Amino acid sequence: MEKAFDQYEVWFVTGAQLLYGGDAVIAVDAHSNEMVNGLNESGKLPVKVVYKGTANSSKEVEAVFKAANNDEKCIGVITWMHTFSPAKMWIHGLQQLKKPLLHLHTQFNKEIPWDTMDMDFMNLNQSAHGDREFGHICTRMRIRRKVVVGYWKDEDTQHKIAVWMRVCAGWADSQDMLIIRFGDQMNNVAVTDGDKVEAEQRMGYHVDYCPASELMKYHKNIKDTDVEALVATYFNEYDHDASLEDKSTEAYQKVWNAAKAELALRAILKAKGAKGFTTNFDDLGQTDGSYFDQIPGLASQRLMAEGYGFGAEGDWKSAALYRTVWVMNQGLSKGCSFLEDYTLNFDGANSAILQSHMLEVCPLIAASKPRLEVHFLGIGIRKSQTARLVFTSKVGSGCTATVVDLGNRFRLIVNDVECIESKPLPKLPVASALWIPMPNFEVGAGAWILAGGTHHSCFSYDLTAEYWEDYAEIAGIEMIRIDKDTTISNFKKELRMNEVYYMLNKALC
């Protein structure tokens, strides 16, 4: 088991009925226990599975689902029908269930015992029958769920369950997520705006405004000794020129000020219980010497690495989404980051998009140890020498995602990408990645634009489109995927069909 999710558990509920007698009930319970123990011992699942018994009646189903709703440790429910389990007995429980649902279509035994199977065996082991009945009632009731089909001991089956578990963890985390905005969105920018009320209804997280002046109160109270200790941590953790440690230089003072800004941000985030934040480079408080003298880019980079959601220019949707990406990514090795489409490189089949930001790119995606540097930044209200971590990203496949508000719904846009090696950028000392959107630059970028995608996105080497499909299913939002098989013609058709579906779906639900 992975320690990252020790605070959570997923409940396993088996469906059966009393028609087949007491011996069958005992066998179902024994098989279910063995399966749950086997899943937990496989080492493939990031969240502990807890067997909650066999449901043989409507009252039992309703009781266990209500209990799941009220248990903070429970982040999802797996159901499996060992025998035939008449689906009417699941109606009231499914009406109550608020936690994510996975329907596992499997069987205790892997193969049919051809020479010995009798009617008793067939009655006991009829998931092929029971799971279809359960699937029907879920579909009739418009219950959103993930269906996993496969033998429970197979790695592919366990992987699909593990993906869903990670998404459930991200979803559970977002249900008490607070994002605070220091300042507002960047003026006149459309895509970073949206309906915060609908976002909280759909995705759980809450967004509050926080004036930069409140952050400055925390900034004033930071002790110099704490700042000096953090500066020493910087020098220990990151490559840097030895001259940067010269306390008589402006560069050292900028690093010192960046450390003070980080401590202030940490203090206010902790005090408010926030899991993410946004900044606006045009709103950083007063400008005298006791206040921020630079964009808190270094602080944002380090806080992202520790799991705080971040969105630039007031982009609260990206801040919340990055936090969810980071949670789902826990225990996986390659890293994730907030990124922005910046500059295009037309190079035939290798045409690519440079991903960067002014400063705020997470070091979890760095190909090698980040380098601490200080350079002039001429953007925003603080045009000054500014500390930052400089690096390039790893080479490899990944997936980037964004959420946009289309007025009548949220759309999750997902694009498979391939990070490639970047050429040196001696005049651009920032963190960056260079990627080719799938299936190629022309189609990938074109589809993203047609879908209304943002210039900000949340990227991971470890998460795949399957994670995002599960997330969209749980949230009840639209998902559009751009991958190796995408064509512009078919993509346009999908967008048009989805437009009609979501307009009609509001009337059906």
Curated annotation (Swiss-Prot):
Cofactor needs: Mn(2+)
UniProt GO BP: L-arabinose catabolic process to xylulose 5-phosphate
Gene Ontology cellular component list: cytosol
Pfam families per UniProt: AraA_central (PF24856), AraA_N (PF02610), Arabinose_Iso_C (PF11762)
Keyword annotations of the record: Arabinose catabolism, Carbohydrate metabolism, Isomerase, Manganese, Metal-binding
EC number: 5.3.1.4
Pathway(s) where this gene product acts: Carbohydrate degradation; L-arabinose degradation via L-ribulose; D-xylulose 5-phosphate from L-arabinose (bacterial route): step 1/3
Cofactor binding notes: Binds 1 Mn(2+) ion per subunit.
Positions with a binding annotation for Mn(2+): E313, E340, H357, H456
Catalyzed reaction equations: beta-L-arabinopyranose = L-ribulose
InterPro entries: Ara_Isoase_C (IPR024664), AraA_central (IPR055390), AraA_N (IPR055389), AraA_N_sf (IPR038583), Fuc/Ara_isomerase_C (IPR004216), Fucose_isomerase_N/cen_sf (IPR009015), Lara_isomerase (IPR003762)
Gene Ontology terms for molecular function: L-arabinose isomerase activity; manganese ion binding
NCBIfam families xref list: PRK02929.1
Stated family: Belongs to the arabinose isomerase family.
Cited function: Catalyzes the conversion of L-arabinose to L-ribulose.
Classification via PANTHER family: L-ARABINOSE ISOMERASE
Name this protein carries in UniProt: L-arabinose isomerase
Taxonomic source organism: Phocaeicola vulgatus (strain ATCC 8482 / DSM 1447 / JCM 5826 / CCUG 4940 / NBRC 14291 / NCTC 11154)
